[in-house]
Amino acid sequence: MVNSYSTSLKGTLSRWMSYSELGVFCDTVNQKIPCKIVLINSKTNFLANPKSALNTLNLNLNSGDDIEIVLIASSEYELDNCVKSIKDILKGYTTLC
């Protein structure tokens, strides 16, 4: 069995964003750090994998929407780097904790 490490980041969006835009940000992180990323809109309980075909749908996140980003990595080091990168990339949209 392979060990995996996971964490969840939660925040409220300060401005409008599409799921595909959020997916691009997450994909940017994933190119540098191998991790699995799942996006959750807490208001609608909508789950999205940034690499799925769901991003072709015109789904949007609005200012004030609560989001959760679940990160899964194979090491604690990779997970820590992924958390830092996601927070850095999304700092203009939300404060994740």
For each feature predicted by the language model, list its residue ranges.
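Short, Lys/Arg-enriched, disordered terminal segments
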Residues: 1-5, 96-97
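Short glycine-/aliphatic-rich beta-strand segments at the starts of folded cytosolic domains
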Residues: 3-13
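Short glycine-enriched loop/turn motifs at secondary-structure junctions
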Residues: 5, 40-42, 64-65
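Short, glycine/charged-rich beta-strand-loop motifs at protein surfaces that mediate ligand recognition
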Residues: 12-14, 41-43
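Amphipathic alpha-helical interaction surfaces in cytosolic regulatory modules
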Residues: 16-36, 46-65, 79-87
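Conserved short beta-strand edge segments in small beta-sheet-based binding/regulatory domains
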Residues: 36-39, 92-97
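Amphipathic, charged alpha-helical scaffolds that flank and support histidine-based chemistry
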Residues: 43, 67-85, 97
